[in-house]
Swiss-Prot record:
This is Nuclear factor 1 A-type. GO terms for biological process: BMP signaling pathway; cartilage development; cell morphogenesis; DNA replication; exit from mitosis; gene expression; generation of neurons; glial cell fate specification. The lineage of its organism: Eukaryota, Metazoa, Chordata, Craniata, Vertebrata. Disulfide bonds: none annotated. A motif (9aaTAD) lies at residues 394-402. Residues 1-194 bind DNA. Keywords: Activator, DNA replication, DNA-binding, Methylation, Nucleus, Phosphoprotein, Transcription, Transcription regulation. Its main location: nucleus. Residues 437-457 have a biased composition (Pro residues). Recognizes and binds the palindromic sequence 5'-TTGGCNNNNNGCCAA-3' present in viral and cellular promoters and in the origin of replication of adenovirus type 2. These proteins are individually capable of activating transcription and replication. Belongs to the CTF/NF-I family. GO terms for molecular function: chromatin binding; DNA binding; DNA-binding transcription activator activity, RNA polymerase II-specific; DNA-binding transcription factor activity, RNA polymerase II-specific; DNA-binding transcription factor binding; RNA polymerase II cis-regulatory region sequence-specific DNA binding. Binds DNA as a homodimer.
Amino acid sequence: MYSPLCLTQDEFHPFIEALLPHVRAFAYTWFNLQARKRKYFKKHEKRMSKEEERAVKDELLSEKPEVKQKWASRLLAKLRKDIRPEYREDFVLTVTGKKPPCCVLSNPDQKGKMRRIDCLRQADKVWRLDLVMVILFKGIPLESTDGERLVKSPQCSNPGLCVQPHHIGVSVKELDLYLAYFVHAADSSQSESPSQPSDADIKDQPENGHLGFQDSFVTSGVFSVTELVRVSQTPIAAGTGPNFSLSDLESSSYYSMSPGAMRRSLPSTSSTSSTKRLKSVEDEMDSPGEEPFYTGQGRSPGSGSQSSGWHEVEPGMPSPTTLKKSEKSGFSSPSPSQTSSLGTAFTQHHRPVITGPRASPHATPSTLHFPTSPIIQQPGPYFSHPAIRYHPQETLKEFVQLVCPDAGQQAGQVGFLNPNGSSQGKVHNPFLPTPMLPPPPPPPMARPVPLPMPDTKPPTTSTEGGAASPTSPTYSTPSTSPANRFVSVGPRDPSFVNIPQQTQSWYLG
């Protein structure tokens, strides 16, 4: 795409990468033009003149492609949050033509109706979600008050919340048909087409000051018919920068699931990584009940056995063995063996790997590929995969190293801490056999458990020196697990020598 420095992590989501080539360039001009007209009216208490509106239109049409694409990326990120998580996959597949159209439900507002969003920053004009979809992906110039003109198709099962662009149509009334004939006839007469009625057939010459046929209609817009059709059919990514080509726009890394195509290099500083991870987590928490988009990749590493990628259950997806298929070939579902190998390939995405520009991806031959290439092949200082949100140096690993060091040093030895937190050394424990290794690390929360001490066996005391001796008394039993590291000592326990005579509890971490 254009310069990665202009994008944030949210603006580079695979959801956005897949849908951006299908956004019409007219949407940017139309939304901004309506906002400019509204601001002008509120400021000057009069409507914008034709000359001023035409100047604004020309300014918006000549805007840099980077600005248009950045706006479209932010708007797609908003729409993604407003679409229910279970329908986001269907939305991408249907808009990109990979799947027949199906209903895509959005999150309702407080009254259970279609939500409204502002398509621009610091704009007081709100648009219904279905209106936004029609303008964004079909390029139809609708006003924000044209929500009543939208008609859902008979195949739509939930017309109140469905935002599927293929299920949304625009009702055409008699006046629209009448004006369509007028515009068509007038436009054809200007092109001097002999097969169409001439201008004299539809326009009466004004007599005695009376208005003719065409004089009865006043066009309020600044777009001509041919210009409106042309700009409404142009994709927003048509005008691109040096790092963005139309050949790349025909595909998306949304369907190229190889680790090399999906990974981005990690940031150079951990502080930047932490900031972006926090921002991503906050954005994911905006929508109630929202889950990561990739069920097989956006979960925690421990839940990999409970979830599978949506490619495995999608009946319309090709099998991993028939990756490079022609457009005429049919779909086939993956076999069980292929599904297992596919899950193995998807497991590679759970590993946070630092890759450079020439790093070879750790992919298996069964990795799911589509006959497309990702939009961006250059790594940048950002994440594009929702699964890689944690730093490679996990705090859990450090906690394990702190609590359970090497087995050779800890076998049969347990550290002891004073109440003031200073360590007093280690001593061999006769009650813990040497070959017994400590179990896995304990959970983060452990309850204090009293340490049972036998009264019959003599305690192991330290040498002369008491508490200042480097070998302090330490007690344990084979039945005591390192998970129970809270020791409660009472005043009646004769096993400890240099302990104050009151009940104390501390943590032997």
